[in-house]
Amino acid sequence: AAEAFRKKDKEAFALHSNRFLEMLRDVDELLRTRPEFNFDKWLTQARSWGDNSEEKDLFEKDATALVTVWGADGDPLIFDYSWREWTGLIDGYYLKRWEKFYAMLQDHLDAGTNYSEKDLPQTHGRESFRANDFYSTLGDWELQFVSTPDKVRTPITQGDEVETATRLYKKYARLA
């Protein structure tokens, strides 16, 4: 998708960005077959430590921040430090971020404007949390995600892991 964007090839950009988003959905589906890869389990455990709704919400917020922005509200310095491959987190957080990023790039393609991250401020080898207008808006969304209690829950497990893995293997083996 990045190469297609640089070449201003809208058709290839759509193909590759959609393929990547589909892959994230498929990874989330595969992880949903195993209880140990579940974001809801993490949040449920965090909420269990609270004695009242206020404490439960705070523990959920802290547990969410730990695996997303890794820090307090504002300007975390090492966001994504604790990335987890968990169902619910991929579909509910990482996929949505990528959708926003690709939509922003698509807007630039449609408008015929350039976009480059070459000179953006860096923190630990990646774009800073609020490196430009897009990342600032994305940062607001990320902090809102962290602060929202009772996030959409995913079933602890869903689907057969062997069937799902076999189907996805066949799907992606043909792309190699």
Language model regions located:
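Catalytic domains of carbohydrate-active enzymes that cleave complex glycans
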Residues: A1-A176
